[in-house]
Amino acid sequence: MLLSISCSKSDNIDQLKGFELWESLNINDYNMTQTISCFCFPYEFTQPKDIEVENNLIISIDGKNPTETIGYSSFMTINELFDFIESKLNDQPEFYEIEYNEEYGYPEILYFDMSKMIADEEIGYNIFNFKITN
């Protein structure tokens, strides 16, 4: 795994290196478990969610239609996570951490603290139990 901790905007391109591997593998259908780390309510929102992706779209979260899941719009496909990373890096966070999967290139762990002077605006995602389904 690649661990990257940085606060420099010039490192943004390096932080998306996992994307090159991910994109080259052309993975469109997969399952994963995703957690969101934030100061969010209700508590259920931050619990691990089993996500099924087909054609790069979330088709189920914990076996249900995504729209039946609390905060469903905050759960992301791998491609959406890469877009999220790029957006957050462009906003120049004070601290961030990203770990990429060596085999597939997707982000396994990402965490952003945009301002150390503001409480409760940090956000993180963890991806595990990744499995290609097609």
Predicted segments, located by residue:
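Short, low-complexity, Pro/Ser/Thr/Gly-rich segments in the mature regions of secreted, periplasmic
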Residues: I123-N134
